[in-house]
Every structure is written in structure tokens, then in C-alpha cells.
Amino acid sequence: MDARERLIVGLDVPTIGEAERLVSTLGDDILFYKIGYQLVFAGGLEFARDLAASGKKIFLDMKLLDIDNTVASGVENIAKMGMSMLTLHAYPKAMRAAVEAAAGSGLCLLGVTVLTSMDAEDLAEAGYNQDPHSLVLSRAGQARAAGMGGIVCSAAEAAEVREVVGPDMAIVTPGIRPTGSDKGDQKRVMTPFDALKAGSTHLVVGRPIVKAPDPKQAARAVLNEMVGALWPANR
């Protein structure tokens, strides 16, 4: 995969009109887009279907979690939409149900381990007695056992997650901040170059591109930073 196949731009905007303008601005530079709750509830599912039909790859970030049958039914319908990736929380029974429902569809299911906006204090407040690092590795192992296609985790855990899940699973990393950019509300962040060197296979970049004065230039800067990490001489 080249950098263009690995960069996922998060369409973190409130309206379809804004998303359409952004996709038009970025043009052929960007192949892969993430669509989450904000846009889904503004009519984003139909927009996602249209983008996929136009040749773009879509990462539908729904973070599903429910009883097995409900998760399976949702995954079956999403698989028919031509999506490339779908997230669900990394709970074993839900993951197993999703894997069975997606079989043969080409949909890559991603287990969400610990949100990159969370740290140990946040987990403790939510009732977890594990630190983020330990919980990520535990859930990564459960995702592999369930037959998931990949993991969502911070780049800080990518190298150890790779040891847990083996060579074939995708490691999708949010919380990516290009060199010199603001961290925003993310607590576990890394640059594109460092994330790829750490073992991430796909990088999700939202606000540093979407909110940039010149999104196309910002996207190209990220791609260039990624190329630097992927170039054989830098391996």
C-alpha cells in the first residue's frame, strides 16, 4: 500500500454540504474517508454510499456495541453498502457475531480498544482498573481471537499490538497530529511519520486537514510525511 491508501481523512463536519465541498477540494489526492456519528445523523449514510460508488473507500466509524443479533443485523446491512471498514467496540461476543455476519463481504471489521482521548484517569472514572496500555493489548488479543480484520489504537501501542495480533491485521490509528500542529482533545498522539514507523497501517487525520486554511495543502503535507516513513531507505 502507498501513502494514499493509508491516509484516512475524517469528515468531521456537521453537514453534507460541507463534506461534499471538502471531498471536491481534496480531489484525487485523497482516496479514503472516515464518516462518523456527526455526519451519519445528518444524512451521511446515503452520502457514504454515494462516495463508495464513486470509487472512494469509506471507513464507517460507528463503534457498534449491542446484543449479538442486533450487531450482526447491523453489520449485514452495512456490508451491503460497499463500505471498506467498520468499527465496533472490542467486546468478544459482539466481535464474533460481527465477523460471522460480514463473512465473504470484503468489509474489514475494526475493534476499538481504548479511545485515544482517554487516559488512565478517564478509565478509572469509568470503573476500569486497567491502565490504557494493558487494556489495549488485552482487547487486541480478543479481537484477533474473534477473527477481526484490524484494531483501532493509538500509535503509542502499535508496536506491541502488532506483536499480539500478528502480521496480517490492520492497525488503524486516530489521534494523528502532523508535526507542529495542536493536540486538540487528544491525549495520546503521534506524528504521521512516527506512527507509521511504530507499526500503524492506516492513519486517521481529521481536524488538521478539515480545519486547515488550505485542506488540500494540509493533506499533501501529511502524505509527504507518510511517504518519508514508507520510503525503503527509511525502513
Curated annotation (Swiss-Prot):
Its recorded reaction(s) are: orotidine 5'-phosphate + H(+) = UMP + CO2
Instruction: Report the EC code(s) recorded for this entry.
Output: 4.1.1.23
GO molecular-function annotation terms?
orotidine-5'-phosphate decarboxylase activity
GO biological process: any one? 'de novo' pyrimidine nucleobase biosynthetic process
What the entry lists under CDD domains is as follows: OMP_decarboxylase_like (cd04725)
Q: Which InterPro entries match?
A: Aldolase_TIM, OMPdecase, OMPdecase_AS, OMPdecase_bac, OMPdeCOase_dom, RibuloseP-bd_barrel
Residue sites binding substrate per the record: 12, 34, 61-70, 116, 177, 186, 206-207
All disulfide bonds of the chain are none
Q: What EC class is this?
A: lyase
Q: Which SMART domains match?
A: OMPdecase
The pathway noted for it is: Pyrimidine metabolism; UMP biosynthesis via de novo pathway; UMP from orotate: step 2/2
Q: Which domain of life is it from?
A: Bacteria
Q: What HAMAP family does the entry give?
A: OMPdecase_type1_B
Q: What does this protein do?
A: Catalyzes the decarboxylation of orotidine 5'-monophosphate (OMP) to uridine 5'-monophosphate (UMP).
Family under the similarity heading: Belongs to the OMP decarboxylase family. Type 1 subfamily.
Q: What is this protein called?
A: Orotidine 5'-phosphate decarboxylase
The scientific name of the source species is Rhizobium etli (strain ATCC 51251 / DSM 11541 / JCM 21823 / NBRC 15573 / CFN 42)
